[in-house]
């Protein structure tokens, strides 16, 4: 092989390695975003469960009051 071909090959390999490094950095960023979203999802799921429990509690209280009113009438 001529030196020119070797130089072209080296340039292509270097560009490929740089591209791989960029892709690794992008992958790391996406992994971090994914972890943050999973954490946020867990928090929202817990909050949703708490709100569901609160709603059920208030529904029971309202139904109890309606029952008392019906008994009085």
Curated annotation (Swiss-Prot):
GO CC terms, sorted: cytoplasm
Assembly description: Homodimer. The ends of the coiled-coil dimer bind to each other, forming polymers. Interacts with FtsZ.
Annotated signal peptide: none
Species whose genome carries this gene: Shewanella frigidimarina (strain NCIMB 400)
Lineage of the species this protein comes from: Bacteria, Pseudomonadati, Pseudomonadota, Gammaproteobacteria, Alteromonadales
Keyword match Cell cycle: yes
Gene: zapB
Subcellular location, record wording: Cytoplasm
Source taxon at top rank: Bacteria
Protein name (database record): Cell division protein ZapB
Free-text function comment from the UniProt entry: Non-essential, abundant cell division factor that is required for proper Z-ring formation. It is recruited early to the divisome by direct interaction with FtsZ, stimulating Z-ring assembly and thereby promoting cell division earlier in the cell cycle. Its recruitment to the Z-ring requires functional FtsA or ZipA.
Principal location class: cytoplasm
Coiled-coil positions: 3-66
Record bears the keyword Cytoplasm: yes
Family in the record: Belongs to the ZapB family.
InterPro entries: Cell_div_ZapB (IPR009252)
Annotated keywords: Cell cycle, Cell division, Coiled coil, Cytoplasm, Septation
GO biological process annotation, one example: division septum assembly
């Amino acid at each position: 092989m001529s030196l020119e071909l070797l130089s072209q090959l080296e340039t292509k390999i270097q560009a490929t390695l740089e591209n791989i490094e960029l892709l690794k950095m992008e992958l790391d960023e996406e992994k971090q975003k994914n972890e943050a979203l999973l954490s946020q999802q867990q928090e929202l799921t817990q909050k949703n469960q708490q709100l569901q429990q609160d709603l059920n509690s208030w529904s029971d209280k309202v139904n109890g009051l309606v029952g008392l009113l019906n008994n009085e009438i």
